[in-house]
Amino acid sequence: MYVGRFLLAGKLEDGTPIAVYGVCSRSFSDRRIEVREGAAFVVPEDPSYITENPYVTYTCARIVDEFLVLTNGAQTDPIADKLESGVPPREALVSVTFAMDYEHDEYNTPRISLITDGETFWLGRVAPEEVYFRVMKPKDGEGYLLSVYGEYAEVPSKPNMTLDREDPLECDPVPSFEHYVCSVIARHDGGRWSLEAR
C-alpha cells in the first residue's frame, strides 16, 4: 500500500511514548533524514534538488522543551516557534496547520501535523476538502497512524494500530508501506525526547 508520508504516535507496550515521521516516495527516493541539535531534516542526496523543489527538503521534527513536533512539511518550524513563545499546543497545531493550508503543489498534498508531550497527542490534517484535528491519550500498546494517502489518510478517532514491537517500523501495517525511503523515530525516556534517523 502506498501512503506517501505518515505519522505514527502512541505508546509501546512498556509505556514508552513514541512517535515516527516517515517518508514513502515514488518521485524522490534519494532522500534521507539528518538529526542535529534537537531537530530532524528531510534532505535529498542530490543537493541540487534543494533549490529545484522546496517540498523535497524541510524540517520534519523539532523538540521544544517537553514537546515534540512532527510534520510533513514547512509547518514544523512555525508550530515549534509558537510553542517556544508560550502558545498552548492545541492552538499552535491548529492555527499554523490551518493557516498554511494544504501544500499547493501539483498534487495538492495534504499537511499532517503532530504535537505531543508523551501523554497527550494533538494530531491534525488539512487537505483540499478536509480540515480535521483531534486530541488523543493512548494507553500502553496503542498507536495512531495518519498518512497523506491511502487507507490511513483520515485522522483516527481511536487507536488504529498496536505498538507490539520495540521497533515501531516493524509494527503492522508499516512493513507493508510501499516505496519507503526514510524516517525519524522519537522516543520519550527519562523525561526527554530523543531522535533517531532511520
Swiss-Prot record:
An example of a Gene Ontology BP annotation on this entry?
A: 'de novo' IMP biosynthetic process
Reaction equations catalysed: IMP + H2O = 5-formamido-1-(5-phospho-D-ribosyl)imidazole-4-carboxamide
The pathway this protein participates in, as annotated, is: Purine metabolism; IMP biosynthesis via de novo pathway; IMP from 5-formamido-1-(5-phospho-D-ribosyl)imidazole-4-carboxamide: step 1/1
Q: Which UniProt keywords apply?
A: Hydrolase, Purine biosynthesis
Q: Name one Pfam family in it.
A: IMP_cyclohyd
Q: Give the Gene Ontology MF terms in alphabetical order.
A: IMP cyclohydrolase activity
The record, for InterPro entries, names:
IMP_cyclohydrolase, IMP_cyclohydrolase-like, IMP_cyclohydrolase-like_sf
EC number of this enzyme: 3.5.4.10
Record flagged with keyword Hydrolase:
yes
Q: Which range is the signal sequence, renumbered to this chain?
A: none
Purpose of the protein: Catalyzes the cyclization of 5-formylamidoimidazole-4-carboxamide ribonucleotide to IMP.
Give the family from UniProt: Belongs to the archaeal IMP cyclohydrolase family.
This one is known as IMP cyclohydrolase
Record organism:
Methanopyrus kandleri (strain AV19 / DSM 6324 / JCM 9639 / NBRC 100938)
Gene encoding this polypeptide?
purO
